[in-house]
Amino acid sequence: MSLRERKKLETRERIRAAAAELFTRHGYGAATMRQIARRAHVGLGTLFNYAEDKRDLVFLIFNEELNAVTDVALAEPRPGQALLEQLMAVFRVHYRWLAGKPVLARILLQELTFYSSGKQAATFLGIRKRLIDGIEQLVRNAQERRKIATREKPALIARHIFFVYSASLR
């Protein structure tokens, strides 16, 4: 990794840490972009290179961890388990992760509704799609094993399951 790339990663990490600290200490509404930039020891323009607004900063804080948690969650279901048990295994990982950071998790859950634009949006939407695709595969496998009887497409069922899960988080 070049020195320039390393400096970018260090800057990104300082911004993530500063935003997480200030959101936790002062609250999402009270923390300002200017305070976050100052705490991260970067200029306001540099901060805006990484996140368009505070909402985007929330996803800068969470995307990397959420991606790793989703990897773990999708590896949890065991072949042969009932679909419900597999789904519980997937969602349990996410629930535990969110429970470990209640203040920041509340902010994330408030801000993720309709989040579709911003510098971090594509990454977040990709993670969410990967989770829905994983649920779809579990549903498809259950259909093929004749463990669930439905003519609905696995993709439709997976989206409904995901939306119920999302609603339960709020």
Ranges and model annotations:
Residues L60, L74-L104, P154-I161:
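Hydrophobic alpha-helical connector segments
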Residues A99-K119, R170:
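Amphipathic alpha-helical segments used for helix-helix packing
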Residues A18-L22, W97, G134:
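Short amphipathic alpha-helical elements of helix-turn-helix/winged-helix folds
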Residues R14, A18, L22-D56, L60:
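Helix-turn-helix
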Residues R106-L108, A121, K147-E152:
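Short, hydrophobic secondary-structure boundary micro-motifs
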Residues N67-D71, G118-R145, A155-F163:
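Amphipathic alpha-helical packing segments from all-alpha helical-bundle domains
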